[in-house]
Design a protein with these regions (language model features):
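Cysteine-dependent deubiquitinase/ubiquitin-like isopeptidase catalytic cores across multiple families
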Residues: 1-141
Length: 141
């Protein structure tokens, strides 16, 4: 399994990458209050609330992997998936945050955050924050 960056979702672009197990989009996060009702994931869908700051890319990739039955997860991730199978999304998120394996893998790829002055940190207006969101087929849809 590997990740490809796409600039288009047309048939030609999708055909170049081979089988697609899921899509991960990068959105600008606006921080607006969302009054929509929370949707409960269907049975068999791995969905975890993000409990770790700055781990949305790791969580998006994990969501694709955990929801694709044709991908061999390996012994540790298969055990993790079975262990968290019946957990609600918030508890799955806590399980991710408490997993030594996932922490090690995330930290091996994560970039160090540059040091930010307190004045810059206080002025949030100029900061743009982005968030990764994954989409996966469920039951062939």
């Amino acid at each position: 399994v590997q990740v490809h960056e796409l600039w288009s979702l047309d048939k030609e672009s999708m055909a170049e990458v081979g089988p697609v197990h899921g899509l991960i989009f990068l959105f600008r996060w606006r921080g607006e209050k969302d009054d929509r009702a929370t949707v409960t994931p269907g049975p068999g869908v791995f969905f975890a609330s993000q409990m770790i700051p700055n781990a949305c890319a790791t969580q998006a990739i994990l969501s694709v992997l955990m929801n694709c039955p044709s991908i061999s997860l390996g012994e540790e991730m298969t055990a993790f998936k079975a262990f968290t199978k019946d957990f609600p999304p918030d508890v799955k998120g806590l399980a991710i945050s408490n997993s030594d394996l996932l922490r090690r893998v995330h930290n091996s790829f994560a970039r160090a955050e540059p040091t930010v002055s307190e004045e810059r940190r206080a002025s949030k207006e100029e900061d743009e924050v982005y968030h990764f969101i994954s989409y996966v087929p469920v039951d062939g849809k």
